[in-house]
């Protein structure tokens, strides 16, 4: 069966037709100014036109009318350096991954440009309110609690909601990571999709056979939210080896959106981690890059363990920063008053999460799930997953700061 044309295909065809028309116009008109002005808008007009085949109703062809990016469906085996969609630093998906368009790792962009700088504190306060930290400060606390109730998953939802029969969450997250990295999707997509899965499972019973469908549709929803040129529902059906049909993927998408009440933009670990990393950045670019790679590696590892659901995303981000700094400089205290001010946390506030992240890094938990570790063993990521960390953290590093010098 021929694949339906998408708008991206139509845009390419329209561009080629416009170029041919321009050449003919130039041949017949030496000045060519008027002809060029007329055909300049042709690609956009043709691409956006309503008469494109299969670009109509979603009920007949899900996603056929949306701009789509169909990665190679052969399997998630992309090597760093392989061709992929270009990701410009500072775009919606964050810094691009190594290998996207062949480029190197890009430092976390400045999240507080001149236009944003006056509002940095307000933005930070709003993000923390969304994660549930400052609900009591809301003017209408009752309404706020009702609206934000579903943004935080239940800590022990496996026992309380699922009856203990879902013990495959770690494997599901590991598989989702393989897809996101293998098909060069935005890194934000993984964090959002995992949060959708946890929130959905906190209040909806899902049997084990449909768990992969939930993860697949969560990736579909997150890719729509993050990426204008997202893969189609057909693509997400195919990556399950057609275990689930396109209609099943779309139906589960509708269930997720209905449950979330279309509140899809909750802050995740990477949201806060990028802000912390930029604010803590020094003048040595290679050191900055290595620290960022280490912290982002730890942040992805944190998704594997359901124990970390109990922590707010900003706490997990702060703990990843602590463990990342400790790993790269084990003899230097990772926390100081400046970092404490930037993150808003004392060491005692994040100690439990620090130990959890450190256990994951050391392989004391979930060492059998290799997707994330293998990804960061690559030279493109400076092999940060192979950098050893001391087995224990010095007790003095886990004490709260009392003086400027610790």
From Swiss-Prot:
InterPro entries: Cyclin, Cyclin-like_dom, Cyclin-like_sf, Cyclin_A/B-like, Cyclin_C-dom, Cyclin_N, Cyclins_cyclin-box. Gene3D superfamilies: Cyclin-like. The keyword Cell cycle applies. GO terms for biological process: cell division; G1/S transition of mitotic cell cycle. GO terms for cellular component: cyclin-dependent protein kinase holoenzyme complex; cytoplasm; nucleus. The lineage of its organism: Eukaryota, Viridiplantae, Streptophyta, Embryophyta, Tracheophyta. Pfam families: Cyclin_C, Cyclin_N. This is Putative cyclin-F3-2. It comes from the Eukaryota. Keywords: Cell cycle, Cell division, Cyclin. Residues 11-21, 29-57 have a biased composition (Low complexity). Disulfide bonds: none annotated. GO terms for molecular function: cyclin-dependent protein serine/threonine kinase regulator activity. It comes from Oryza sativa subsp. japonica (Rice).
């Amino acid at each position: 069966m021929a694949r339906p044309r998408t708008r991206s295909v139509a845009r390419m065809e329209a561009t080629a037709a416009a170029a041919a028309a321009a050449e003919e116009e130039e041949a017949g008109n030496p000045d060519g100014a008027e002809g060029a002005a007329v055909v300049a808008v042709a690609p956009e007009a043709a691409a956006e036109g309503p008469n494109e085949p299969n670009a109509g109703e979603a009920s007949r062809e899900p996603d056929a009318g949306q701009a789509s990016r169909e990665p190679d469906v052969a399997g998630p085996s992309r090597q760093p350096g392989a061709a992929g969609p270009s990701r410009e630093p500072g775009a919606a998906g964050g810094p691009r991954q190594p290998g996207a368009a062949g480029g190197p790792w890009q430092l976390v962009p400045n999240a507080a440009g001149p236009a944003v700088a006056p509002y940095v504190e307000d933005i930070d306060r709003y993000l923390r309110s969304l994660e549930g930290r400052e609900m009591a400060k809301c003017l209408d606390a009752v309404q706020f609690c009702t609206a934000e109730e579903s943004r935080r998953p239940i800590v022990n939802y496996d026992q309380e909601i699922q009856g203990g029969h879902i013990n495959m969450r770690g494997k599901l997250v590991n598989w989702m990571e393989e897809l996101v990295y293998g098909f060069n999707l935005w890194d934000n997509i993984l964090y959002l999709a995992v949060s959708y899965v946890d929130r959905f499972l906190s209040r909806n019973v899902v049997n084990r056979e449909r768990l992969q469908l939930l993860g697949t549709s969560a990736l579909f929803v997150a890719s729509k939210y993050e990426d204008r040129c997202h893969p189609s529902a057909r693509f997400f059906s195919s990556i399950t080896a057609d275990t689930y049909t396109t209609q099943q993927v779309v139906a589960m998408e509708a269930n997720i959106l209905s449950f979330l009440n279309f509140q899809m933009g909750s802050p995740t670990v990477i949201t806060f981690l990028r802000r912390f990393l930029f604010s803590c950045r020094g003048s040595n670019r290679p050191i900055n890059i290595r620290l960022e790679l280490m912290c982002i590696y730890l942040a992805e590892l944190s998704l594997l363990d359901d124990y970390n659901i109990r922590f707010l995303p900003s706490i997990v981000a702060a703990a990843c920063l602590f463990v990342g700094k400790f790993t790269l400089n084990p003899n230097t205290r990772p926390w100081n008053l400046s970092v404490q001010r930037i993150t808003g946390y004392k060491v005692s506030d994040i100690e439990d999460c620090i130990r959890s992240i450190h256990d994951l890094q050391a392989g004391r938990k979930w060492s059998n799930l290799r997707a994330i570790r293998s990804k960061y063993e690559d030279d493109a990521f400076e092999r940060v997953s192979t950098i050893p960390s001391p087995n224990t953290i010095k007790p003095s590093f886990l004490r709260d700061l009392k003086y400027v010098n610790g």
